[in-house]
Structures are given as structure tokens and as C-alpha cells.
A protein has these predicted regions:
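Eukaryotic alpha-helical solenoid repeat scaffolds
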Residues: 1-168
Length: 168
């Protein structure tokens, strides 16, 4: 269902395309204007835009969190008014961001890629914030599949989830 929302078939209607562009530009505008002093107000505004375009909102939010590491702890706790479908879209975008990573380890073979580690931090903070509402079965299935394929880097995601959500 979510991949249909990302398809170009939905943008054939000119009115819908106009409002999608308007929402996209507004989301970008409010993300650019967010700083440490107005996070609550901007989060509230962005949640309203998330009702209309949740996939674009979460893709943009994950990109911002991969770029600015302090954005995760500032922004995630303020997303309290999300609907269940928006929370589900957030999990879909997290899985998409984790799968879309071509390199998880730096070229030296030892260090984690900064974007991948920040995606892991975002995922664990997101699951902790919405622990009672989020369905993590697909995330656990992703971790299981990656571990069966021999990708042990994903065990760090499992470690972060256990340590943040379960407080172990």
C-alpha cells in the first residue's frame, strides 16, 4: 500500500499534484526553520502536515536525523499526536532507510557509517516513543533476515532496541 503512495500514478491528477507540492514545500520550510527553541511548535505544525503526506514527512525526517545527530532527541519526543497510520508509515520509512543503505561500514572496515548509525538511533528512539502503538514485527523480520544472510552489523540495531526500549 505504501509503495503505491510513492508511485507516479497517484500524481496524474493536477489538483492532487498541486496540493502535494504545497505540502512538500511547507514540510521543507518548517524543517529548515526548526531550531532548539521552537521544536515543540514546529513539531506540532509538521504533525498536521504528516496527516496528509506521512511518507514524505518521515522520509524527510529520517534524512534530517541522518544529517544532524542532535535532531533525534529534540524532535522524536514531540511527535505525540500522530495517528496509527502515520506511525505505521514511519516504520515503513525506517525499514526503507535501513534497506536502502548500500554501505553500512566505512571503507576502513571497522567503523559504522554515520548515516547508518544515526538511522539505528532514530529507529530505536521511534520505537521507544511509540512502544505501545508501533508494530515492530516487520523490523524484527528484517533483523532476522539480515542475520540469516550473514550481515551481523544489524545486530547493533537489535542491541539498541533492547537497550533503549527495554532499558536493559
Amino acid at each position: 500500500m505504501y509503495s503505491y503512495w510513492q508511485s507516479e500514478e497517484i500524481t496524474k491528477d493536477p489538483d492532487l499534484l498541486f496540493y502535494l507540492k504545497k505540502h512538500y514545500l511547507s514540510i521543507d520550510y518548517h524543517f529548515r526553520r526548526t531550531d532548539g527553541t521552537n521544536v515543540k511548535e514546529k513539531a506540532k505544525i509538521l504533525v498536521y502536515y504528516c496527516y496528509a503526506t506521512p511518507l514524505y514527512f518521515f522520509q524527510n525526517l529520517i534524512f534530517k536525523c541522518q544529517t544532524f545527530d542532535n535532531f533525534i532527541n529534540l524532535f522524536i519526543p514531540n511527535l505525540t499526536a500522530l495517528t496509527e497510520i502515520a506511525i505505521d508509515c514511519g516504520m515503513y520509512c525506517i525499514l526503507d532507510a535501513l534497506e536502502g543503505r548500500s554501505s553500512k561500514i566505512e571503507e576502513n572496515g571497522v567503523t559504522l557509517n554515520k548515516g547508518f548509525s544515526l538511522t539505528i538511533d532514530f529507529a530505536s528512539s521511534y520505537v521507544k516513543c511509540f512502544a505501545t502503538k508501533v508494530d515492530i514485527s516487520l523490523l524484527m523480520q528484517y533483523i532476522t533476515t539480515q542475520l540469516q544472510q550473514g550481515d551481523i552489523v544489524v545486530s547493533l540495531l537489535l542491541n539498541k532496541l533492547i537497550s533503549k526500549v527495554a532499558n536493559v
